[in-house]
Amino acid sequence: MDLAELVEEIKKELSFAELKGKKISIDAYNALYQFLAAIRQPDGTPLMDSQGRVTSHLNGLFYRTISILEEGIIPIYVFDGKPPEQKAQELERRKKVKEEAEKKLEQAKTEGSIKTSELKKYAQMSIRLTNEMAEESKELLKAMGIPVVQAPSEGEAEAAYINILGLSWATASQDYDSLLFGAKRLIRNLTLSGKRKLPGKDVYVEIKPELIELDTLLKKLGLTREQLIDIGIIVGTDYNPDGIKGYGVKTAYRIIKKYGSLEKAIEKGEIPKIKVNFNVEEIRSLFLKPQVVEPKENLELVDCDSNKILDILVKTHDFNEERVKNGIERLEKAKREAKGASRQTGLDQWF
């Protein structure tokens, strides 16, 4: 759900120095999809091992997590569980998009007349994150000594709940739904920052982390969180992907400001009832009362298992052994320093 137009005035760029010593609960699937999309070979295909198994996600997870730790940030990766039934339509839509992209990709390869940029586009659109890839990602993170949380349902909701409980300073995702789930602070671009090529253009831009604070956003807009959720429902969420036809985010904001709720706007005829083909209260409840649990997992950094990391990356997936060993050295050093920064941040709160 895209709230970009509404957050434009209150979002602010962050330096990594401002995040030093802080724990961030990360929507793991969101991060893994970013790695799968960004870490590609020149023809758009993902990195693969000698057996043809995709490794882009492991490459991104290992090296990007080390970079985050080197900035003094402690990541907590939160993985999806079983999605709500109401998400079935959106998941089916995504599946069809991937299948169509795969067909176009194969057709383009056969014809051999399409631009490399088009090949990349179709390759990225056909990205799949399998259960096996997710499990292997958890295994790697645990071997690295990084906190991993298994959500009962939506990882994004659980990451937001960890933030609500005060167990993390912010949640990190590209998706604004984190705000609807009640995250106090949302950081975008945490796992994406650096120079990135614009899609379909030979232009590179500097991507920096940005912070959106829920309370600041709600005060600026003069809304409650429930009303922000209603705007999301009008525009479309994962639980009603089509939203209400003909209404953009600015119109949705105007309507909710005027009537206070989606039901009232329907009752007064501002939004024709015939256009609403979903249960408003049910969808709102999925954001206000998502299936979440207080994590039982240890949320602190622990010692890494170097042999396990080498086994996963080098022995199983053909990563360069020297590079991985160098990464492990960086990892251990960064974790020591990040722990120190976290303790200092805790002390600073008392003075």
Swiss-Prot record:
Record: residues binding Mg(2+) 1: 27, 80, 154, 156
GO molecular function, one term: 5'-3' exonuclease activity
Cofactor(s) the record lists: Mg(2+)
Region (I-domain) residue spans: 118-260
PROSITE patterns: XPG_1
A UniProt-annotated Pfam family: XPG_I
EC number: 3.1.-.-
InterPro entries: 5-3_exonuclease_C_sf, Flap_endonuc, Flap_endonuc_arc, HhH2, PIN-like_dom_sf, XPG-I_dom, XPG/Rad2, XPG_CS
Transmembrane segments: none
Residue ranges, annotated region (Interaction with PCNA): 343-351
Intrachain S-S bonds: none
Keyword Metal-binding: yes
SUPFAM superfamilies: 5' to 3' exonuclease, C-terminal subdomain, PIN domain-like
Region entry N-domain, spans: 1-98
One biological process term in Gene Ontology: DNA repair
Keywords for this protein: DNA damage, DNA repair, DNA replication, Endonuclease, Exonuclease, Hydrolase, Magnesium, Metal-binding, Nuclease
PANTHER family in the cross-refs: FLAP ENDONUCLEASE 1, FLAP ENDONUCLEASE FAMILY MEMBER
Function: Structure-specific nuclease with 5'-flap endonuclease and 5'-3' exonuclease activities involved in DNA replication and repair. During DNA replication, cleaves the 5'-overhanging flap structure that is generated by displacement synthesis when DNA polymerase encounters the 5'-end of a downstream Okazaki fragment. Binds the unpaired 3'-DNA end and kinks the DNA to facilitate 5' cleavage specificity. Cleaves one nucleotide into the double-stranded DNA from the junction in flap DNA, leaving a nick for ligation. Also involved in the base excision repair (BER) pathway.
Entry-linked NCBIfam families: fen_arch
HAMAP family linked: Fen
Name used for this protein in its record: Flap endonuclease 1
Name of the gene this protein is made from: fen
